[in-house]
A protein has these predicted regions:
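Histidine-centered active-site/metal-ligand motif
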Residues: 19-21
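Short Pro-Cys-Gly-centered "Cys-loop" motif that presents a nucleophilic cysteine in a tight turn
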Residues: 1-17, 26-155
Length: 155
């Protein structure tokens, strides 16, 4: 829905209980993250309220955002963030493994050609990890191990 209205890359998405996580890469000379999120939140509220017969405000607060490219090591931070998002439903007891989550976006980085009902664009940082998709996926798993061991990488 939103991806056909606005031009952006959705690099990660996961639904967790009462909230969701998105990693959105805006594109030069296209719409802002604020406009994209306004649309997503408005449509989500409309659909939920209609489906449940609810009226009134749906969201508690404005969305939170971080500019990944402004971190000291954007690539390391991006990969750590993907695993943080992937493991969020696991920490909440909603799944046993990020690969089994409701959306399961992490599989797009582990299985070449993996498709979901929403379009996930594999981030270009991922392709810098190796010469082939399988090599990139293997190296990407290093970040899962680091995340699970709570190793702070340099970002």
């Amino acid at each position: 829905m939103c991806q056909s209205k606005y031009k952006f890359e959705l690099n990660a998405a996961e639904i967790v209980g009462n909230h969701f996580h998105l990693v959105i890469r805006t594109l030069k000379d296209e719409d802002t993250i604020s406009r994209i999120m306004q649309f997503i939140k408005a449509r989500t509220a409309e659909k939920y309220n209609k489906a449940t017969g609810r009226v009134g405000p749906f969201w508690n607060e404005r969305f939170g955002s971080t500019i990944i490219e402004e971190s000291s090591n954007p690539e390391e931070y991006q990969f750590w963030l993907f695993w943080y998002i992937g493991y969020n439903p696991v920490k909440k007891g909603e799944s046993r493994d990020p690969r089994e989550n409701y959306i399961g976006f992490i599989n797009c980085y582990l299985k070449e050609g993996f498709e979901l009902p929403i379009k996930i664009t594999v981030h270009h940082y991922f392709y810098r990890l190796g010469d082939s998709f399988s090599e990139c996926a293997k190296r990407f798993l290093f970040y899962e191990d680091a995340y699970r061991k709570r190793i702070a990488l340099y970002f």
